[in-house]
């Protein structure tokens, strides 16, 4: 069931929301399946949907999502940031804003997980100018955060200055 859903869902323009909902209903009591459910939606190809990042962000409000659970947080946020290059590098920079917002939020709860999310920025200087400028703004949002953990400050130093 999982493999079939993945092959249908990820690259299709069709949302298959009925299949996604069915998978959730059948597996909502299995933690690993819930992580997969969030991850699958995070890696879907956006097909030019300008609200795609908003849709991913709205999944954080789902009753089964708990950002304090590291596996659940990474299944949605980590999957989007590391595995969805089209969504992450959206034309309006919303993917970078989503990343920065979540790094700052997770840093207050779990600095180790936040610093691992920071690794997504290691290659920002290789982006073309348009994307590099947007990414840099997100990096400076994180940099200006009060009470940022030592873990994230160290990563930020490496990312910005090396």
Which functions belong to the PLM regions below?
Residues 1-162:
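Long, ordered, helix-rich scaffold segments
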């Amino acid at each position: 069931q999982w493999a079939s859903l993945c092959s249908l869902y990820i690259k299709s323009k069709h949302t298959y929301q009925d299949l996604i909902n069915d998978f959730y209903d059948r597996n909502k009591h299995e933690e690993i399946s819930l992580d997969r459910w969030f991850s699958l939606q995070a890696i879907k190809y956006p097909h030019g949907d300008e609200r795609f990042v908003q849709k991913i962000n709205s999944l954080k409000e789902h009753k089964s999502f708990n950002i304090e659970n590291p596996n659940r947080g990474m299944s949605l946020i980590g999957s989007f940031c590391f595995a969805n290059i089209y969504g992450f590098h959206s034309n309006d920079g919303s993917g970078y804003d989503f990343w920065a917002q979540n790094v700052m939020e997770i840093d207050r709860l779990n600095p180790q997980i936040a610093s691992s999310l920071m690794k997504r920025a290691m290659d920002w200087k290789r982006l073309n100018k348009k994307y590099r400028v947007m990414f840099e703004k997100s990096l400076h949002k994180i940099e200006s955060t009060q009470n940022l953990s030592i873990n994230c400050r160290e990563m930020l130093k490496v990312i910005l200055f090396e």
